[in-house]
């Protein structure tokens, strides 16, 4: 399986994003995630698999951050996951993305892991909601589309 994944990565069909343990501040050697380089290909291949909209948003965000020159990791914070830890130079940005933050369960799922990170790097939740909201803990909810076109 890994040789096939390596071949697909080498052919620029998929991107490998390693997992990073935020608490211990180290890259993990297992449980990496893979994202397709072309979201249209992903949709064509998985059209009948019931792939969720949020998974598509995550894939688009991965491609965008790589295009902007960031090194990406999937963040691990205890039992929780951060969609991406984007690193460029000495700077880090923690990113979660979701369809909406208008229900309490999603707010808990998306903001909760970010509030438990005890460093001062930028933390953001990107959603399809139209407004920018700053959470009490300094975490910004920013419109996904606005982020893609200019953020």
Please tell me what each predicted stretch does.
Residues 1-92:
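Accessory nucleic acid-recognition modules appended to NTPase machines
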Residues 130-151:
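Domain-level recognition of nuclease-like catalytic cores that cleave nucleotide substrates
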Residues 71, 122, 138-140:
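Conserved beta-strand segments of alpha/beta enzyme cores
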Residues 112-121:
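Arginine/glycine-rich "motif VI" loop of SF2 helicases in the C-terminal RecA-like domain
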Residues 82-83, 103-106, 131-135:
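Short active-site-adjacent structural elements
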Residues 74, 120-127:
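Short, hydrophobic beta-strand segments that form beta-sheet elements in well-ordered domains
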Residues 35, 93-95, 124-126, 140-142:
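Hydrophobic/aromatic beta-strand patches that form the interior of the parallel beta-sheet core
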Residues 90-103, 110:
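Active-site ExK catalytic segment of metal-dependent nucleases
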């Amino acid at each position: 399986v890994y040789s096939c994944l390596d071949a697909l990565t080498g052919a620029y069909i998929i991107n490998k994003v390693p997992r990073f343990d935020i608490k211990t501040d180290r890259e993990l050697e297992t449980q990496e995630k893979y994202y397709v380089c072309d979201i249209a290909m992903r949709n064509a291949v998985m059209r009948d698999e019931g792939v969720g909209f949020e998974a598509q948003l995550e894939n688009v965000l991965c491609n965008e951050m790589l295009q902007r020159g960031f090194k990406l990791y999937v963040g691990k914070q205890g039992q929780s996951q951060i969609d991406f830890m984007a690193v460029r130079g000495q700077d880090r940005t923690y990113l979660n993305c979701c369809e909406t933050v208008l229900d309490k369960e999603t707010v808990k799922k998306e903001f909760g892991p970010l509030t438990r990170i005890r460093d001062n790097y930028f933390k953001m939740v990107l959603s399809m909601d139209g407004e920018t909201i700053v959470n009490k803990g300094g975490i910004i909810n920013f419109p996904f589309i606005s982020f893609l076109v200019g953020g």
